[in-house]
Structures are given as structure tokens and as C-alpha cells.
């Protein structure tokens, strides 16, 4: 019997140092005959021994894609530090906006995701290549 392929969608990268990554690593650790891929929508680098494949989509990549359609809206991430992180200036702006929690920032983020071309050929190829049996998205509140 072939391994069960599970595709998990998340906001944050699957990192054992954050609550999502720690919880899901504990849930899936030690289960034989599964393969897991993770599509995540934030900056950062995954860090765990469970997931085999990653795909990252960020607001920044969506905005770049809206400005220039040849710029990819997402990319497959390999553990060798291939994920997109913010530079120091961008990180300060991002943290400030997150702390202030202005409603306009939520609207702007929703707008970018609404008009953004997130369903890209790269994302479709990633999903087609992985061929998931189950797609799972945790509900965050």
C-alpha cells in the first residue's frame, strides 16, 4: 500500500518553535506510511522533520505579481534556506502594522488576496506533483 499523502494549508510555516508547527509535529510524529506537504502564507522558514515539501505564498509576492505578471506569486521552498524572509526595514513595518491592528491593514490584506493571482501555475504544478489524497486546513480564530 502506498503512503497517504496529506496536504496541509497554514498561515505560518511549519516550524517546531511555533504553536502550529509544534502541535502538528506532535500529531503526525511516528505515523508510518504518510507523506506531508505544506502550503503556507507567511514569511519565514519551515523547520521540522515531518514535512517533505513546502510552497510559500506571501502578500509581498502577490503584490509583485500584480505589478509584473512574470513575477511568481508563490514558490516551492526547499529547506536549504530558500524561503522568503523580510529585510529589517520590512520586518519593522510588518511588526508595527501587526501590533497596531488597524482595520485598514486587514482590508488591504484581504484585498490583495482577493485580487491577487495566488492560484498560479507554480501552485497548480506543486499540487499536481504531490498528488494529495487529503487536503487539510486548520481553522484559526
Each model region followed by its residue ranges:
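N-terminal subdomain of nucleotide-sugar transferases
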Residues: 1-79
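Conserved nucleotide-sugar donor-binding subdomain of glycosyltransferases
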Residues: 77-134
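Short His-centered aromatic/hydrophobic patch
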Residues: 138-141
